[in-house]
Amino acid sequence: MPKERRSRRRPQPIIRWVSLTLTLLALCRPIQTWRCSLSLGNQQWMTAYNQEAKFSISIDQILEAHNQSPFCAKSPRYTLDSVNGYPKIYWPPPQGRRRFGARAMVTYDCEPRCPYVGADRFDCPHWDNASQADQGSFYVNHQILFLHLKQCHGIFTLTWEIWGYDPLITFSLHKIPDPPQPDFPQLNSDWVPSVRSWALLLNQTARAFPDCAICWEPSPPWAPEILVYNKTISSSGPGLALPDAQIFWVNSSSFNTTQGWHHPSQRLLFNVSQGNALLLPPISLVNLSTASSAPPTRVRRSPVAALTLGLALSVGLTGINVAVSALSHQRLTSLIHVLEQDQQRLITAINQTHYNLLNVASVVAQNRRGLDWLYIRLGFQSLCPTINEPCCFLRIQNDSIILRGDLQPLSQRVSTDWQWPWNWDLGLTAWVRETIHSVLSLFLLALFLLFLAPCLIKCLTSRLLKLLRQAPHFPEISLTPKPDSDYQALLPSAPEIYSHLSPVKPDYINLRPCP
């Protein structure tokens, strides 16, 4: 007899239901949506004369973006404030972090290698070959600063570094992953102004960050002035940088407006009492959701509520497990019933085959006896020795009796270990036990829903209300630029020097300030 095989069904994975319930409860937490804004202000500019005006990006995501950028895969990293005599862009570590016992400036020499005016042309991949003629220092073309930002998140400030030079920089902000090769502009045909206007700067940044809101701080002073001496430097090669510059704050009395704005209409280069001033805005990327959110407050919950929630969760998980077990048992019972019907048909077919084999064997035996008697009557031996065959009749083996004995009822072969929570009989019939199981399962499930339904309704309602409150609403305003007569534009003795610094008229239509 072959050994009886038992098929065991594992208990329902309660961990799966726990994870599902915790996922539903996690929906009560508000999802953080990142909205970045480009704001213009003067928070990062230094007021001292002849000093280095640095900028910082105080966020760890920038360092991660640098490490993941394809342009910085093999770039060296420096720990000095200057390399080859020129200051580099640096990312100071977060507050409180120290390296080797002292606070260190971590600098990176990534593409491009000269993100400021003043670098040597052989070190600058953006140097224009068309500017090899004898030109003044104001003919320096624009530089492109690539910042590989993974995502707009956190609060950080972005301006540029100034160390005795006028920072005529055109920004090109990109989010990683970047293309394999940077798309450098072709400057062989037309002159590209170093700084068109703040409107062009906003437009370029808007294209680089399509998923970020653009706004600015409507509070004076709007931008600092950069003092430029009215002189040029001639050389046999291309101009390397503007002359030495000084940085100071905008004179609020000179640039006072009723709206708190200072809008250069046609030019960014003005003539003030101290000399020629170039107006450039500092830039900052601010996360609106983080900046506008209130500081987190700790909510104390009573132990009774925690116990009630834990008890409700336990009862609910038990009810779900019992309900699933009852449904599984019902399906297994139906499957066993169908298989037993098929088994009964198979047993009937085996019995019929057994009877047919018995009849065939009886007929074969009768035929052999008749042939043997006939051959002996004629004076021969029996049939097989006469035809010289040791076995001239078919020997029929009938094993259907053994096979039929192995076919036990399927309900007796299947183990019922999966019914471990309800492994009781009480002398009841099967349908009564199934009814009790189903009623208890439905009762526990209803009890679980009664405990959890108020929490789910409250959480979903609060979530929808919060999403409605956080919907961005920007009032439309129209800013009219001040006429050119309000500012004395610089008219140098050599107009060709400043010809490429005359920006186009910026677009003031449909500008949206921060809420």
Swiss-Prot record:
Motif annotated as CXXC, chain positions: 212-215
Entry's Gene Ontology BP terms: fusion of virus membrane with host plasma membrane; symbiont entry into host cell; virion attachment to host cell
Side Cytoplasmic, residues: 457-515
Motif (CX6CC): 384-392
Start and end residues of each stretch annotated as Fusion peptide: 304-324
Stretches of the chain forming a coiled coil according to its record: 330-376, 388-420
SUPFAM superfamilies: Virus ectodomain (SSF58069)
Glycosylation sites (chain numbering): N129, N203, N230, N251, N256, N271, N287, N351, N398
Top-level lineage group: Viruses
Disulfide bond residue pairs: C212-C215, C212-C392, C384-C391
One GO CC annotation: virion membrane
Extracellular topological domain residue ranges: 34-435
Modifications after synthesis and translation: Specific enzymatic cleavages in vivo yield mature proteins. Envelope glycoproteins are synthesized as an inactive precursor that is N-glycosylated and processed likely by host cell furin or by a furin-like protease in the Golgi to yield the mature SU and TM proteins. The cleavage site between SU and TM requires the minimal sequence [KR]-X-[KR]-R. The CXXC motif is highly conserved across a broad range of retroviral envelope proteins. It is thought to participate in the formation of a labile disulfide bond possibly with the CX6CC motif present in the transmembrane protein. Isomerization of the intersubunit disulfide bond to an SU intrachain disulfide bond is thought to occur upon receptor recognition in order to allow membrane fusion.
Keywords, in A-Z order: Cleavage on pair of basic residues, Coiled coil, Disulfide bond, Fusion of virus membrane with host cell membrane, Fusion of virus membrane with host membrane, Glycoprotein, Host cell membrane, Host membrane, Host-virus interaction, Lipoprotein, Membrane, Palmitate, Signal, Transmembrane, Transmembrane helix, Viral attachment to host cell, Viral envelope protein, Viral penetration into host cytoplasm, Virion, Virus entry into host cell
Lipid-attached positions, S-palmitoyl cysteine: C455
Region of interest called Immunosuppression, as start-end residue ranges on this chain: 365-381
Statement: the UniProt record of this protein carries the keyword Glycoprotein: yes
TM ranges: 436-456
Feature type site, description Cleavage: R301, S302
Keyword Secreted: no
InterPro entries in UniProt: TLV/ENV_coat_polyprotein
Region forming the signal peptide: 1-33
Complexes and interactors: The mature envelope protein (Env) consists of a trimer of SU-TM heterodimers attached by a labile interchain disulfide bond.
Protein's UniProt name: Envelope glycoprotein
Gene transcribed to yield this protein: env
